[in-house]
């Protein structure tokens, strides 16, 4: 009882000291409850909606108190730019939750300082240069054709289908090919379906509030059930990744012994060469590979699923996209598909951007942490604060976007500057390393998909109500596939 009284006293003493000091004006904030603060706002499985309502009331920068963790939410492009571009070094660190320590800090997503700089500099060698990622285009094209093959039996029988699983396997195969230089041949393979399920579960549970992350004293009394499940799933994925990495190491050693100069066949080979040179630890290789497989498959597949729903509900836009893509094929020499020709499909490109904006897949991005005190937009933010990039509000506010809830691809055709306000892949030095590979994959897969198949439904498919989590996923639905 005495401990609780002391905690409450210290909490309010700190709160009053910071908020009554005129030199340390804090961002506006909703009413804060003792001990738990504003944790109740996380209990909803759609926290982006709660934070969007706070944005409409308190503006582009506001403060929340999650237990003992001071949290600042940034919700418009200009304030995000001020933080992550103009003051990027202050906001560069990740905020790591206590119950996620099992993920370790030896990966590209959660690491900070020298470890992150090392992993970032190595990974960007394969993920950033266009000439490097271009070599993966034939693989992406081949996988898209395999996806279409998986739909053929439904096309022939005129059966309606939920395409979600097939699309997730397609993008998982793409990232597995990128990482390990192999793919799952059968879209009904139980192993690949299990992987898809693991990844889906990680993103569904990822946003569930765990009180111990914000009130550490609770760790002494119980372990959250969600944490146990989350940890077990990660252990299964780590085991899978380690087996695949070990296979690549054996191939690498064999090629090296045979004086085969073509030893760097995939991304993991690059990491293993650094490992063999003592530049990376084994754990860093495993954890970084895990990050890329999980992030690289889920978000891209969910984007494509949202695109299919959006264009199924808007047949006129789907037809315009098809006609432009068909014209692209006719005019394109030898029907060669390459991301470097994307300027030849302006309307299709604008549709992709509008789906990215209107149906944001990752509404709140990965949290950051300030590494020193800073004044932002006239407000004081102390060192160690959790910073949330509110992507959802940034993409749907009426200051940056005219009629933000209207699906209107033409907005990007008429204003080239709007694309800069899309922050799906983050902002600043910690933005998504693989965003160029992701954009290339999405462009190629959907170009071939909408050239080959017409998606239709007898009724409108639900767009607004989505399954919550770290990413937003449409609920199960069925559509008809018609061969073009």
Swiss-Prot record:
InterPro entries: Cyt_P450, Cyt_P450_CS, Cyt_P450_E_grp-I, Cyt_P450_sf. Its EC number is 1.14.-.-. It comes from the Eukaryota. This is Probable cytochrome P450 555A1. GO terms for cellular component: cytoplasm; intracellular membrane-bounded organelle; membrane. Its cofactor is heme. It is found in: Membrane. Belongs to the cytochrome P450 family.
């Amino acid at each position: 009882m005495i401990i609780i009284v002391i905690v409450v006293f210290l909490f309010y003493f700190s709160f009053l000291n910071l908020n009554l000091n005129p030199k340390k004006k804090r961002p506006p904030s909703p009413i804060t409850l003792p001990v738990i603060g504003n944790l109740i706002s996380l209990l909803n499985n759609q926290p982006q909606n709660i934070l969007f309502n706070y944005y409409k009331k308190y503006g582009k920068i506001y403060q929340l108190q999650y237990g003992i963790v001071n949290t600042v939410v940034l919700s418009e492009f200009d304030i995000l730019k001020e933080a992550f571009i103009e003051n990027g070094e202050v906001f560069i660190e990740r905020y790591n939750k206590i119950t996620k320590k099992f993920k370790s800090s030896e990966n590209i997503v959660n690491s900070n300082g020298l470890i992150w700089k090392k992993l970032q500099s190595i990974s960007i060698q394969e993920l950033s240069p266009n000439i490097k990622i271009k070599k993966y285009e034939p693989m992406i094209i081949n996988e898209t054709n395999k996806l279409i093959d998986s739909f053929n039996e439904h096309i022939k029988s005129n059966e309606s289908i939920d395409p979600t699983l097939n699309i997730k396997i397609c993008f998982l195969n793409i990232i597995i090919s990128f990482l390990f230089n192999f793919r799952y041949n059968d879209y009904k393979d139980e192993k690949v379906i299990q992987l898809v399920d693991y990844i889906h579960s990680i993103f569904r549970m990822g946003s569930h509030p765990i009180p111990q992350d914000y009130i550490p004293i609770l760790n002494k009394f119980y372990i959250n059930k969600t944490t146990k499940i989350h940890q077990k799933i990660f252990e299964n994925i780590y085991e899978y990744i380690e087996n695949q990495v070990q296979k690549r190491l054996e191939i690498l050693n064999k090629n090296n012994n045979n004086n085969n100069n073509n030893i760097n066949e995939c991304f993991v080979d690059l990491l293993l060469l650094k490992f063999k040179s003592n530049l990376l630890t084994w754990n860093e290789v495993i954890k970084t590979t895990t990050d890329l497989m999980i992030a690289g498959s889920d978000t891209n597949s969910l984007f494509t699923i949202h695109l299919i729903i959006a264009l199924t509900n808007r047949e006129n836009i789907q037809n315009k996209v098809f006609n432009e893509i068909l014209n692209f094929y006719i005019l394109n020499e030898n029907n060669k598909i390459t991301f470097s020709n994307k300027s030849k499909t302006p309307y299709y490109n604008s549709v992709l951007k509008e789906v990215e904006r209107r149906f944001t897949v990752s509404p709140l991005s990965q949290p950051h942490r300030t590494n020193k005190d800073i004044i932002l937009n006239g407000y004081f933010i102390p060192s160690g604060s959790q910073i949330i990039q509110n992507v959802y509000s940034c993409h749907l506010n009426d200051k940056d976007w005219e009629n933000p809830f209207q699906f209107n691809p033409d907005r990007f055709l008429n204003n080239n500057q709007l694309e800069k306000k899309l922050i799906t892949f983050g902002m600043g030095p910690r933005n998504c390393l693989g965003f160029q590979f992701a954009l290339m994959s999405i462009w190629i897969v959907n170009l071939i998909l909408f050239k080959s198949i017409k998606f239709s439904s007898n009724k409108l498919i639900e767009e607004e109500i989505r399954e919550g989590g770290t990413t937003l996923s449409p609920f199960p639905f069925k559509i008809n596939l018609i061969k073009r």
